[in-house]
Each structure stands twice: as C-alpha cells, then as structure tokens.
Swiss-Prot record:
Natural source organism: Mycolicibacterium gilvum (strain PYR-GCK)
A Pfam cross-reference name: CTP_transf_like
Catalytic activity as recorded in UniProt: nicotinate beta-D-ribonucleotide + ATP + H(+) = deamido-NAD(+) + diphosphate
The protein's name: Probable nicotinate-nucleotide adenylyltransferase
Alphabetically ordered keywords of this record: ATP-binding, NAD, Nucleotide-binding, Nucleotidyltransferase, Pyridine nucleotide biosynthesis, Transferase
Name of the coding gene: nadD
Metabolic or biological pathway: Cofactor biosynthesis; NAD(+) biosynthesis; deamido-NAD(+) from nicotinate D-ribonucleotide: step 1/1
Length: 204
C-alpha cells in the first residue's frame, strides 16, 4: 500500500484490512513515499517521521509490515520504481498495489502506464460515492484484463490526512482519527504546527 502517510490514519488501516480480506492477501506492505514529487505545493513531514508513524500504526496487526524501499532509494518517489523494487524483493509473489482512487486516476494518465500493470494488479480504494472520471480512464480500463484493476469503497476513507494535519495545526484533537500511538508521536515531535496545508490528492 503506497502513500505519503502524512499522517497515517485509521482510514488507511481499515482500507488495508478490507482489501486483505476481500483479496485474501497474505501480507499488506505499507510503503511510505520518500520525496513525493507531486507534493511540492506544501511542506511534507520528514520521511523518517512518516515512516515511524506508519510502523507505530501497523505494529499490532501481524498481517501488516512497513517497507523503506522508497525512503532508502533517495530522490523523488515514482510508483514505477516502487513496483520494480517490490518485484525484485518478491519475485514469486502476486503483487497488488493498493492506492487511493484519486492517485489511480493520475497513474492512468501517465505515459507508459501499461508497464506498471505488467508488474502488479492495482486496487483503488475510495470513499463511498467516488467515481473515476475522464475519457483516458475509460479507455485505459477497456484495454486492461478484467482482473488488472479493482475499485473498493471504504467508508472510513472519509477521514483524510489533510484534515488530520489541519486539526493538529489548530491544536484540535486527532484522537480516533489516527491510532493512539500516532497521536502521541505527533504531539511529542510537535508535527504539523506552523504549516499551511494544501489539498490532499495523495496516495492513501
């Protein structure tokens, strides 16, 4: 599951659990982005903080793990590089790449997006009522095998990282929106203070 996780919230965890159940996945690997190229319009919390919050949030679920492939690679994070690294580490596994439906819409507009679907199946998770828009998406889906792309609605994705950051900046509670350990980490590190969050548009 790829995402900025800035911060990781309960919607991410519910989405991962739901997808693991629906697709009978042995493991869900959370992959925090290193330097997200599409987020230059706002400050992004340091990668190590986002990585540690993800470790804290997923620690209690034996089906969840966290990978540093994007962080340790350095430079801007691109989905194609993430998939190549995960494939190299898991040559015999059936890979499913879980991402936000909005990010999936962006991926399908890139050049050579077909290469990524040769490495993994894609699962776009979204809040109820979200629809993929755009002629390029319809055309892309028509070219893909039936099992290459799935959309899953997750009610908990009404929670957003943008809202969590804004609440933390305003000293409003984020309890029950993010795991308890992440609440404590954000407070200890004084994250999201003195920031001016922009729009979401991120991988969840």
């Amino acid at each position: 599951m790829g995402g900025t996780f800035d911060p990781i919230h309960n919607g991410h965890l519910v989405a991962a659990s739901e997808v693991a159940d629906l697709f009978d996945l042995h493991e869900v690997v959370f992959v925090p982005t290193g330097q997200p190229w599409q987020k230059r319009s706002r400050p992004v919390t340091p990668a190590e903080d986002r990585y540690l919050m993800t470790v804290i949030a997923t620690a209690s679920n034996p089906r969840f793990s966290v990978s540093r492939v994007d962080i340790d690679r350095g430079g801007a994070t691109y989905t194609k590089d993430t998939l190549r690294d995960l494939r190299a580490q898991n040559p015999d596994a059936d890979l499913y790449f879980i991402t936000g439906a909005d990010a999936l819409a962006s991926i399908l507009s890139w050049q050579n997006w077909e290469e990524m679907f040769a490495i993994a199946r894609f699962i776009g998770v979204s809040r109820p009522g979200y629809e993929l828009d755009g002629k390029h998406i319809s055309a892309a889906m028509a070219e893909l095998p039936a099992d290459a792309l799935h959309l899953v609605e997750v009610p908990a994705l009404a929670i957003s990282s943008t809202d969590c950051r804004l609440r933390a900046e305003q000293s409003r509670p984020i309890w029950y929106l993010v795991p308890d350990g992440v609440v404590q980490y954000v407070a200890k590190r004084d994250l999201y203070r003195n920031q001016n969050p922009a729009g979401e548009g991120e991988r969840p």
